[in-house]
């Protein structure tokens, strides 16, 4: 029988703050090592593409950002559902803290895609199905951020953001399968679970390292933001006051 103790413990802001403090350094170090390794390998040592030459190297930023942008939104939807069903405050904190990170990753994916598209397609932007769906994803992130800031009541804001996150998740399969459902300029998926990558190993391995690095970076950034938000929300409790006092004394 599965042990759900950890899930119930997540409902405790104090427990989350303590356990996340142990995870944070590991994610931060892993992110730094993986991103530096992937960048140096991919940008300096990976062979050029036989068609696109060195312009393809932007893939080492574009693909990880696009992966993370979509994964982050799925996480928002899951956290939103947990918050609505189990009334778990940490889930609401996760939604509020992850949305800006996801928005930035979506923006980076769109920006690098535009830079890559100029030499490849001859245009900075085309109303391609996948590009349009990614733009909608950015607006969904903006909507969640705006709702969280516009609604003064914290519980009402959490519910509104959760509903938007859950409804908007329908856009994720559209992004993923748009290249299969419609005729698009965008290339098929770089990685699939069932098929070996078409590019040689010296090109896709640094890309995989970058993807893992971006996920570790996301985890580290999310934990930092959530820990600060938890301290803010629990500022009247004894444990939060003690933690803030310890942090202030440590900073001196």
From Swiss-Prot:
It comes from the Bacteria. It is a multi-pass membrane protein. InterPro entries: Cyt_c_assembly (IPR002541), Cyt_c_biogenesis_CcmC (IPR003557), Cyt_c_biogenesis_CcsA/CcmC (IPR045062). Required for the export of heme to the periplasm for the biogenesis of c-type cytochromes. The lineage of its organism: Bacteria, Pseudomonadati, Pseudomonadota, Gammaproteobacteria, Pseudomonadales. NCBIfam families: ccmC. Its main location: membrane. Keywords: Cell inner membrane, Cell membrane, Cytochrome c-type biogenesis, Membrane, Transmembrane, Transmembrane helix, Transport. This is Heme exporter protein C. The chain crosses the membrane at residues 26-46, 66-86, 97-117, 131-151, 162-182, 204-224. GO terms for biological process: bacterial-type flagellum-dependent swarming motility; bacterial-type flagellum-dependent swimming motility; cytochrome complex assembly; glycolipid biosynthetic process; pyoverdine biosynthetic process; type IV pilus-dependent motility. The keyword Aminoacyl-tRNA synthetase does not apply. It comes from Pseudomonas aeruginosa (strain ATCC 15692 / DSM 22644 / CIP 104116 / JCM 14847 / LMG 12228 / 1C / PRS 101 / PAO1). GO terms for cellular component: plasma membrane.
